[in-house]
Structure formats: structure tokens, C-alpha cells
């Protein structure tokens, strides 16, 4: 956990903007429905076989205001929501929690990928991580494990990753998985 705090939590300027590696305006593979996918820059996991290794360095990418992302989303009336991927979204939890609140206020849903497990995120007891979790509808958790790679899985790359419905999970304290027949 100390490594997370040292590596992922940036200075004050990092919290106001989001360091973005790239965006996909209309993805159909990063969650249910048409999605606006934001790939954040910076990841401490370094999973062998990662789909997005260029997102690992914490330098690079571009700094974007959450409002700029929202304005881009508003241009596509077919969107179901936003997907936060990376990189590691929880390394920018404060700014992404703010963005996710605005996304919900506009009527969209929030999907988030993380290389952490939900249990690890909750154990960090970081208020910004908790704020982001509370704004996520569907969490795809766990690191990509090359030996468990399975291209038949819905929205995941390896069989250890889970599709967690966050709101009922936080309410009950028991993991609620998404049905995979969407």
C-alpha cells in the first residue's frame, strides 16, 4: 500500500486534471453498449502481455480537464457511458471520481478496469479510491495474467478478472457478479 501511495498519488496539480494516454470515442468492446473509453496514463502493475503497455509510464500522455471529456461525450447521443481504463485508473482516483460523478449526472453509466482486486482497493482505505468506487457501476478487476488469457471472455482478457456490480457489492458486503448474457 505504501508503494501505491508513493507511485500513484501525484501532487496537487495531478488531482485537478486527468493524465490521458488516449480516448476511443465509440468503443463496443470496453463494456456494455457504445462507450467513450478513456485510457489513463500511468500503471504500477506492468502485467506481462498487457494490451496497453504504452500506458505504463507515469509521464507522457496529455492532461485533460474532466469537462473536456464530458463535452466530447455529449457529441455522441448513442453512448451508454464511459469506460475508464489504462493504465491504472485508481492512480488518478480523485480526478476520475469527479469525472464519474459528472458522467452519472448526465445520465450515463461508468465502467472501470483495474489491475487491483476490489478487496485490495477497499483495504487501501483511501477516501478518493472509495469515492471512485462509489461512482463505478461495473468494475473489471484483477491483473491481466498471460497464463490465464482467454479471448472468449466478455470484456476481460484473463479468467482471473471479474465483472463486479459495484453498487450491490458495496451495499451487501458480498461480491455481486454481472450476468454475462448481455
Question: Where are the model-predicted features located?
Answer:
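Aromatic (phenylalanine/tyrosine) cluster motif
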Residues: 3-4
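Conserved Radical SAM active-site core
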Residues: 15-21, 34, 52-132
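P-loop/Walker A phosphate-binding loop and immediately adjacent motor/lid segment at beta-alpha junctions
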Residues: 92-104, 111, 149-182
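Glycine-centered loop/turn positions within well-structured domains
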Residues: 45
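Residues at the C-termini of beta-strands that transition into short coil/loop
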Residues: 24, 143, 167
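N-terminal [4Fe-4S]-dependent radical SAM core
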Residues: 9-39, 48, 52-58, 175-176, ...
